[in-house]
């Protein structure tokens, strides 16, 4: 951090605030403590008559691969509002009846993903600027090797379990020695494909 976002001073230094346990950027001019924060991502597994909405990414990372609609929560938005907006932006779709599906904490990226299951109001879809294509697929038609992110695979598997939305799955995603991602789930670690 070069400048204080509060006063504009270039007198920002790393130090430990009184009573804190970590180093923070602190403005020497106005005293503002700048805390690093997690980014919140919201999205949904949206379905219509048992078929799942997938979006083909038009942007990096993972351009050309498939994902569920999701994105960063904007200031002043609830998690549900962000999931609804992202689905509309990426797939031209309207969703209702959002139910909490899963929460994924990714500390290595400073991100927390909150995913919902939701109902599509109609099967009419239109790819937005961040999508090359959008489609509805049955669970049997999912090409697991074409999915963009490990948490997308995990969320889809969780959606397909008999408990569905009944419990919140908090998984830790760990980088493996070969560059792949391992998912720690209920005490077990399973290997995911490399990204």
Regions found by a protein language model. Give the residues of each.
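Acidic, metal-coordinating catalytic segment for phosphate/diphosphate chemistry
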Residues: 1-44
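Polybasic "coupling" helices that flank or enter modular domains
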Residues: 170-171, 176-178
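Active-site donor-binding loop signature of nucleotide-sugar glycosyltransferases
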Residues: 29, 57, 70, 118, ...
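Conserved hydrophobic/aromatic beta-strand scaffold that supports enzyme active sites
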Residues: 3-6, 24, 45, 54, ...
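Short connector loops at helix/strand junctions that flank enzyme active sites
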Residues: 22, 37-41, 47, 61-63, ...
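Unchanged
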Residues: 73-158, 162, 166-169, 181-195
